[in-house]
Amino acid sequence: MSKLFELYVLSKLRAVFTGRKEVQYHVKKRRQELDYLLKPAEWAEPYVVDAKYKPRYGERGGVNIDDAREVSGYARLSWVYSELDLDADAVAPIKCLIIYPDQKEEERFTFSKTAEPQFEKVSGYVRFYKVGIKLPVIASKNP
C-alpha cells in the first residue's frame, strides 16, 4: 500500500506542478533515496516531502519520531541543497512535509500552483509540516 500511496501522491503533485523539476520523485544519491523534492516556481521555498501511508497521523498531533528524523535528515543533506540550487550557508533549513491519507478531508488535494498552502505545523519541530489527503473510494453497489 505504501508504494501505491506514493504513486497516488506523485500523480496529484504532477497534475498541479507541471514545470520542469518542480516535482522530483525518488531522488537518489549515495544510497539515500527520498520520496519527493518539491520546488514550485511560484512558491517562496522548496520542500522535502515524504508520503507516509499512516492514517493515524490525522488522528493525533504529531508524527512518528523515526519518520521525522528520516525527512529531517534528507532536508539537511548537502546534495539536496545543490539539487534545489540553494546555498546551504545562506538560507534557512529546507522545509519538511509529510503527506498522509486522511478520509476526513473535504477535498482530495488542495495544493495550488500559485500559493503555498498553510500546512499543519508539527509541534516540537522547526519548519516541519504535515497534510492529509483524501483517497478515492469505490462505492459499493451492495447495501
Which residues make up each language-model segment?
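Catalytic core segments in nucleotide and nucleic-acid processing enzymes
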Residues: M1-P143
